[in-house]
């Protein structure tokens, strides 16, 4: 919008829009290519509905730069009451995990730990990449319009020997929409389609994650 563009320019941010509708991964790939980052830069992928304390953010960036992480994630609170949180310390899903999650409202592939960890993957609401690593991965797979692009890129990163870190010293607040958890909603079918795409690319013989 015109107002958002003006506000972005006022704050010193670069605003880009060409009016095209793209998936989450494709939009981030487009942004990455527009920025012409150096190998030592970092690239942050985040949803528009997240918030983070500015002082904490500066410390987070310092931690990322000092780490050996190719992909870096933090603790995620679902609201500013700080009651419900996701550790983003996750194992790669098995074939039946997503279906069990929908039925029992439980994420089997998410381990709630409050300590520094090396998870299989972290959620796409907030991911920090070393620029060089994102480039080597060729960004997100644009076959995913929304959902599972985060799991996929972390899977490919692990196959290349890259390091994913979860650091709970830092956190964001993500006012996540829950439409995707409702059976037969538009988001449900989008999630299901992405799930099929993921398991076609990365078939697993585990029935559930452990």
Give a label for each model feature.
Residues 39-51:
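Short beta-strand-to-loop acidic/aromatic patch adjacent to the donor-nucleotide binding site
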Residues 27-28, 55-59, 150:
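Acidic donor-diphosphate engagement hotspot in glycosyltransferases and nucleotidyltransferases
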Residues 155, 159-210:
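Active-site-adjacent helix/loop segment of glycosyltransferases
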Residues 18-38:
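Glycine-rich, basic loop-to-helix element that forms the pyrophosphate-binding segment
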